[in-house]
Amino acid sequence: MDPLIRFSSLVRHGLRFRSRFELIKKDAAPASFAWYPYDSFVNLFPLERLRCMAGLELKEMAGSRPLLDLGTADGALAFFFESLGFTVHACDHSGTNINRMQGVRLVAAALGSKVEIEDIDLDGGWAPAQEYGLALFLGTLYHLKNPFAVLERLSKHARYCFLSTRVAGWSPDHTVELGRVPAAYLLAPDECNQDTTNYWVFSPPGLVRLAERCGWRVLASLRTGARDSDPTTEAGDERQFLLLESSRGEPIS
């Protein structure tokens, strides 16, 4: 890993905040409580790299508008960015959230946070009620039935977006190469991690094509994880991160 990324201000502050976040979770609920099981703070490494690749500053991207965290889980990054001075709007869907959004509310109360928390259904006709300078849309796209509609709608209300999702270079049986074409694989209900909320896994060119067709310009892109990736297996898990700018100009209502 590039030491300039590893020791960047964003990453260093994030790792310190992670320690505080984990302590708060221990005090906020019993040990049996079902917290989001993944480390959201590892996303700061690719986000910082994308930012550097594009030559942009976070404050420049956010501007004077709020930062939107779509798929906030327990609010790890929402509360972190609030600690950096950003006004944050954190959204998730209680119907699919592991603890029905109790976790994010418990942490908010413990922190005395002013983060605006909203329970939304992205596939249920969600329409942003305000404009955003920067959106975080991480690890959520493949949980959507209609990612095109959501990403297109977001491009009308946010100027910049950090997007990440699972991608695949090969079909599950590795007989069809997906990575050379803009394509998407539709998962069976039990095909990926036994999670019925997983739907579309794009090829890397497919994700770029989707973003462009939805009204975004791709400013920077990187991929992490498996090299011979597929849509279904743990060993074949690859993620693509994009830094996007709306091609529609300033967000409109």
Give the ranges of each region predicted by the language model.
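A conditional alpha-helix N-cap/helix-loop micro-motif detector
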Residues: 46-48, 143, 200
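S-adenosyl-L-methionine-dependent methyltransferase catalytic module, highlighting the catalytic core
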Residues: 125, 132, 136-137, 145-252
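Hydrophobic adenine-recognition pocket in adenosine-nucleotide-binding enzymes
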Residues: 140
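Conserved N-terminal segment of class I S-adenosyl-L-methionine
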Residues: 1-131, 178-179, 222-224, 231-253
